[in-house]
Amino acid sequence: MSGNFRFMMDQKDIVRFLTTTIDSFIQDRLINKEQRTQHKDQCAERLAAEDGNTDKETEVEYSDQAVLANLDWGIEALEEAINTYNMETKLARLDYAEKMLQVCAMLNPKQKTAGVPNSYLSAWAHLNLSYLWKLRNNIKSCIYHSLEMFIVDPFFSRIDFAPELWKNLFLPHMSSIVGWYSEERHKLMMEVLPESTDFSYTADFDKVFNESLVFSMRPNQLEKLQKLEQLYGESLDENTRLYAKYYNDCMNPDSTSSKKVVPMLPIAEPPMTPLHELSRSVPDFVKFGPILPKSSGFSMTTRRSNDGLNETTRENIASNSNHSKGEQSSLWAAKESIIEEIEDDLDSEHYDASVDSDKINIFSPEPKKNIKDEDVEPKVYRSNQKNQMNSPNISPMESPRRASNYSSTNPLRRKKESKFLRLLSNRFTGSIVSDHSLSSSPDTSSDHIFTGDEEVMVRNNIKRKNDSQTPSMNQDNENSLVLNDSSHCESEDGYQSSSSFPKLEKLTIGSKPPKDFVCPITGQIFSDPVTLETGQTYERKAIQEWLGTGNTTCPITRQALSANILPKTNYVLKRLIVSWKEQNPELAQEFSNSNTPRGSSCSPSAKDITMVSSIQRTTDSPSQKYKDDYIRQRNNRFTRVSVGASPTSVLSQAAVETIINSLTPYITSLCTSENLQDCEQAVLEIARLWKDSKTDPQIHSYLSKPTVVSGLVEILSASLNREVLRRSIYILSELIFSDERVGETLNSVDSDFDCLAMLLKNGLAEAALLIYQLRPVFAQLSEHELIPSLIQVIQNKSEDIDDFQLAIDPKAAAIAILEQILIGGDEYNRSVNASSVISANGIPAIVKYLDKTEGRRPVISILLCCMQAEKSCKSSIANRIELSPVLELFHAGNDSVRGICVEFLSELVRLNRRTSSNQTLQIIKDEGAFSTMHTFLVYLQMAPMEHQIAVASLLLQLDLLAEPRKMSIYREEAVETLIEALWQKDFSNNQMKALDALLFLIGHVTSSGKSYTEAGLLKIAGFDQPYNVLMKAEQLGHSDNDFMETMEDEKNAMKSWQKRVASVLCNHENGSIFQALEECLKSNSLKMAKSCLVLATWLTHMLFTLPDTGVRDVARKSLLEALMNVLQSSKNLEEKILASLALKSFISDPTVHEVLRVYAKSIYRILRKLKKYSTVAADILKALLNLNSVDVTELWSCKEVVELDLSSNGEVLSLHYLNGQVLSGHADGTIKVWDARKRIPRVIQETREHKKAVTSLCSSVDKLYSSSLDKTIRVWTIKPDGIKCIDVYDVKEAVYELAANAKLACYVTQGTGVKVFNWLDAPKFINFNKYVKCLAVSGDKLYCGCSGYSIQEVDLSKYTSTSFFTGTRKLLGKQTIHSLQIHDDLLFACGSSIDATAGKIFSLSSKMVVGSLSTGLDVHRVAINSDFIFAGTKFGTIEVWLKDKFTRVASIKMAGGNTKITSLASDADGMMLFVGSSDGKIQVWALD
């Protein structure tokens, strides 16, 4: 058939066509927000209509409500995703929308939910899912859901959801069906027309759809036409579904088959094959088939009754008559033409339900048949003018109507009312006026859609008018004018024909303001519109007068008003009015300053009302009664009369003129006088007169002239009289509230704002109100530095200004301006401005303002800004604030307000004292009329993503106030939200917020509001520096006198709180938080990874203080690998220490030993370097080296760094390491000081104060002691740049060995025994008949290594000696202990090798041998660090043993061959080894 040729393409072309078409359609919908909103409203209208058709007593199940709620939430979330520019928020809202929409998309289409067909809900969901996948750039899924929409419900997809898409995808395939329908309709029309009429199929084909012919049909013909339309619609739906499935198959070929099979193209077959090709003259609306009006709900069948069938069908078909022949409007334009349906303006009580039916039913060919109420459609459209003129019983200006003999407001009848399918032509509304009238106002085609009650009214009106005009069409002109006036005032649009109203011919549709801009009471354009709870909008002054007379109902709807205070001005409507006035200045002036009020264009004058009354007195016919009722109804809604006539009227014109005449001389004086006093007096008088008449538009217009405004501004800049300044601001403020153009006038001159800013700085509080009304931008406000002045306004008491009440309290205006300043600008500006508020002592006054109901939100916002910028002010706010207003604001506010409240409370509880935080939390928990925890829980489940973290954190803290012994839904939901946020890799901001919330939850908060959890953990690990720096800064920042007194309570409270937090977080869902932290540690964000590491370290540290519930295994499996990775790869010292602290917690677990073995080689060197900063690193290293499964020899590694040739100074007799420096003593008496902080030592000092060889070096605290063969002992001070000799002691004998401290010196001379010198008295000799080779001091004990392989212990307090150890004497050779070292309460004694043992290790406490060093070489020198024992031999080798296990690890061979090792020293960290030899060289080894 025609049109199918364009789809004769292969599968790739079809896919390309579908992609292009559907993608373009969805893209257009996403771009056009107004269209989406309009479409949602239309669908909601259908749902509402269906709700009105169902039995009200039927209770809707909760599950059904949930389904509808999911659909609504899904659409709202999708709309938020479309509107936001934040990619993280967009993705989150899309995920949420998908979950909600999938619920409806998967419904069974054959069932119903809450009376609504599931197919409709599912199709609607699929449409929104196609939007969703387009936003995700997944075109394939987008196409899938678009096609599923047509498969699930082709009918409503065609008429409601996507008519444009249906036209492009499916309509070209339906040409045969449309051709069949056209032929069948042609046959029916041929039966109606007279035989003489030329009405062939090929000539004037569009006349087939001229529905005026339907009025001539007989009942059986109407029934045939109805069945034809029903069959036509079913055919379109069936084939639409068929082609949608075909398209779906093309997009998704069978993947299971190895051979691709092209789907078979379906054929749209009509019930009968048409005889002709489809004529181009068939209107587009016919091709779309029957539609269902949205006001009809989902009723898809027609009530077939013998009484009402013909009239119902006639009305169903008659709606097409007003579609003109040449009209080629697009489908969407047609759809938009019926978006708005005007409400029924008339109460049913004004209608006569007993009107004679055979007088009303003037169109029925059988006048005896009545039209039942069930057959009355919600909309009836007029036939065109030509057909009306051909009817002998119809006036040229009237459209045919039919009435009901039952009241349309009867609830029983409404409940039984049937809805009918009608063609798309019903979307196009015609006019009841002539072609001339239509051409004069082409934009009003959508202004004449009636509700059912209005139709009945108009039909009755027309019938009665015809009855009164039956004798003659030439009745009295005046009476005819009145009747025409009343009969043509349709609904609220007040439409009229220019030929029918000669007296009001100027007030046509094109020359009057939109009805929504006109007050129904005053008849004038709104200047201060207020919208009541009933949805009706009135002028503020008018409705105030109405309520002031004792009325408590809405003037139009008669609904009771619950609020006693009028709402705020409807600024949205006001802005629209201002915009319209700018485009229509002359018309706006006419309707604003008209001498005669205009309620609408069809409102009768007083003369008309008089004439109607006279007619009513002479005629009692139903027609006249109806006219009287109708005119009264229109008068009540649209007209106003003089002041004395109605309590809803405003000032009479005479009173207005009197006030204007009174104002004129003062205005003249203000604008022209050069005398300041005269101008000031004029301002006072103008204010007095304006106060009583400010709502009258004419007076307002008179005072809004630019010259008057300029005069008032000049007074502000020139006058010094505060009363005059206040009155000037009062007048300008009221003018701006009524007309924003006055504010625009002031904003156009920068000096005007500067003047107001200066007045505010000079202490005029009212200036804040005017500045607020001018809506300045942040740059203007920041330029003038208004914060101190605004704080002053807030702090000062309100001054009494007599009875001149300002619209807004200056304090409220000041707070609003202050909020704008604080939230404006960049982060630096916000911080500086918030600090200015705090320094101006503004917080106490701002907190007090919370007592007022209005203005709480900006107060909370200001306080939140202050706390975020200056954390230290939290305590001040917490001590002053009452939290009840904050919670009340949370309960009553929207999502934005609730978000501010939650953020405020979350910041407020982050105090530096746990006890104070708990007290604040307890107040939050107990305050409020409702359960705070329950309210937070409900809000948590529906809060936007950006607020969920704060709510969850606050809710969890409230729950933790009590010991978490039982299951708590609050706790579970809060922790679940926080952990879920940690999993959201696509939303790094949300992850960071969750981590911050969890870290602050621990409770380590400084007085400045910073978390010091990391510093506290580093301190536990032995790295105190960050903690000490932080605490030092905090102490400088504040003084807390009673801190020490409450330290114990604070410590206990913190311990209890942290234990609760750790228990709740670790045990939630068997440690799921550790799995989430594992993912966070993989983040590319350094800040996030650091925060996650801190939290993981704290949790693992606390985990082993809690009872083991199996969570430890989960933590180990989740974090161990990640912690090892941090330890190996991180370049940050703090991170390595934190990872070490977390790893230490797992060391006791045997399963961790295997992991340590695997990583031993890679972490060994790291731990060795780290142990100088952290004690936990040393603990881990010790555990690693002591593992039986670890081969220490594989870990050992050393490298010679440098060899220093000092042979010119002779032998290197002693080496000593002290605070990053190495000191060497040489045979020529030289002492050299080396900087050993780098791998290659550097000489920083060389001194030769000893005359002979320096035999020994030792230190104590900051003193160095040296002994020499020159018979002296020298004492040196140690400085970073070298040493300085401060004392010299001549001991009269050569000193071979020295051990000294601040109290005494023990030294060895040439003879036996040892000498002890207390630096004051003569040396004491302790003789034990042995030659001493080495010394070691521990406390008040001196240990002497002697010949004969023995050790003597000397009590320095008593100067007595005892034998500590006596070795086995050998007959051959000398056995001597050459070196003693004390380390970690162990005494290491090394010397001659006896039985392959050259050293023994003793416990000083038990004096027992705890180990031995196995080697066949004699050991002359020993050096010990935390990990290893180094033993130097006389043959140039150094034996290395593991310190804790005494296991030989390696042997280091000196480069000089068999040179004797004379001295050894190791640095404190065990990373470097310094070796002195007899050939005068020092070798430096790096111990990796």
UniProtKB/Swiss-Prot annotation:
Enzyme category, top tier: transferase
Pathways involved: Protein modification; protein ubiquitination
Span list, region Disordered: 297-330, 351-414, 432-500
Biased composition (Basic and acidic residues): 366-380
Reaction(s) this enzyme catalyzes, per UniProt: S-ubiquitinyl-[E2 ubiquitin-conjugating enzyme]-L-cysteine + [acceptor protein]-L-lysine = [E2 ubiquitin-conjugating enzyme]-L-cysteine + N(6)-ubiquitinyl-[acceptor protein]-L-lysine
Compositionally biased tracts (Low complexity): 432-444
InterPro entries, per the entry: ARM-like, ARM-type_fold, ARM_LIN, ARM_LIN_2nd, E3_ubiquitin-ligase_LIN, LIN_N, RING-Ubox_PUB, Ubox_domain
Domain U-box stretches: 512-587
Top-level taxon: Eukaryota
Name the record gives this protein: Putative E3 ubiquitin-protein ligase LIN
Annotated organism of origin: Medicago truncatula
